[in-house]
C-alpha cells in the first residue's frame, strides 16, 4: 500500500510493521534529525492503523513456527480456504495471533523503546490494528482513542441536523479499550482525537462540542486533542486553508472567539481527572480468541476498526456484559490474557501494575488459552472474586488442539467450584461489590480516588432537570460540589445512611459537576436555585446586524421572530 496523503518526501510504500529491521531502517533518518534535541519534544504520535492488507512479512513463516509451534507452509490450503470449518478457523486464529504478536513486539513496543532512548513519550492510536487492542494501546506511554462523527444526545435545544452530520462511532465500549489499557498498565494520561467530522465545516457550534467531550471524559479520557486546528497563512483566500476532515478550529471560524470558554471547561475537567488514580472496581476479560477464531466470511487479515464494530464487537457476550455493567452502575476496565498472567491477589483484591480491582468477570466465551484458565483458577483460590458468565468450551489454535481440549475438560472437572451464577449482579452484591445506583436517574459518571477520597465527574445528558438527593456508594462523607464551567464551588446538603451518602443535586440538562468527598465540610455551602415559574415573553421587532465575517456581509434586517 502507498502512504495516504503523504507529506513532502514521504510518498512511497508503507512501513512493514512486523519487522524489527524495517523499523530500524525507518527511524535511522530521525536519529540524525533529533541529535541534540533529546527530551525537547514531549511526545511523538502514531495515528490509527490505516494500513490495509498488510498480511505478511519476509520472515513470517519462521516467526510463526517459533510462536505457534508448527510449520504454516504445510497448512496453506486450509489457511487460504475461505470455508467456515473448525480446522481452517483454528489456523486462521493462529495466523491472526501471530500478526498481533509481531505488531506488538516488532513495532509498537520497539517504537516506544526507541522514543524513550530520545527521552520522548509515545502517543498511540491502536484502533484499526490487526491485533489485541488492549495490549497494543498499553504499549504506549499515552494510549489514544478517537471520536468520529456526531453522537445523539437528549439535551433539549441541541441541534443535530441530519444534513450536517455523519453518524458517530464514539461507542462507550470502544472508547474504553484505550482507557482500560492505560488503567491496568499504570498510564495516567488517556488522550483522544476529538471532534473528527463532528459537523460539516463551519457548521459546528461549541454547544455541540461540549457533550461529545463529556462522553469521552466519562469513559476515561483526560487529555483531549482537537481534530483539528488547521494552519492557514494570511495570504490564503478566505476562508483560508481547511483540512478535509472538520472541525476547523482556527481564527477563520466564527466559534474561535468563544472557544476559550470551551477550552477552559475542558481544562478544568482534566485538571481533576488527571489527579489520583482510576477507581473502577470490575475487570472484564476480552475473549479475543473468539474474534480470531471467527471465519469473518473467509477474510484472513482482520483489523479491529472503529468503523466496523458490527464485525467484531456488537452482538458479542463481551459487549452485552459491558453495556449491562455500565447500565447497572458498575465501573469497568477490560483486561487481556497477557495482563491476567501478570495479576496477583492481596487480601482478596486483584492487583495489577496500574491498580487494584474487586472482581474479574469472564463473559461467555468459546475459546480460552489453558494458561489463562489456569491463572484465573489460581487467582480464585488465592481469594479473588472471579465470576464466569460461561465456561470456555475449547482452547484456541491448531497445534495439538485435541490434547488441549482434553486438558481443558480435566481442569474444569477438577474445579467444579467454577460454576456460572444465574445473575452476575447478585454474585457481585454477595461479594459486597455494589453499583453506583445514581445511574438510575439517567446521570452518567466516572470516579477517581484521590488520597483515599472519591472524586465523581457527573453529567446530565438527559432531557430532564435532576433535582433530588443522589446516592454515592461511600459512607459518612461530606461532599464538595465544583462546577467546571463556572468554577463555582461549595459544600452540598448531604444525608448519611448506612454505607451511602446522599447528595442534594440540581442539574439542568447538559450540566456537569464534580463531587469530591471529604470527612469535614471545608467550604461555604453550595447555593441551590429554585425557579419561581414565571415567564417573560419578549415582544417586538429585532434589529439584525452582521458586523463580522466575510468576504461579504449580508444586509442588515429587521425581524419579528427569532
Where are the model-predicted features located?
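Catalytic and substrate-binding clefts that recognize carbohydrates or anionic sugar/phosphate headgroups
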Residues: 1-35
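Carbohydrate-binding surfaces of carbohydrate-active enzymes
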Residues: 30-43, 48-143, 148-562
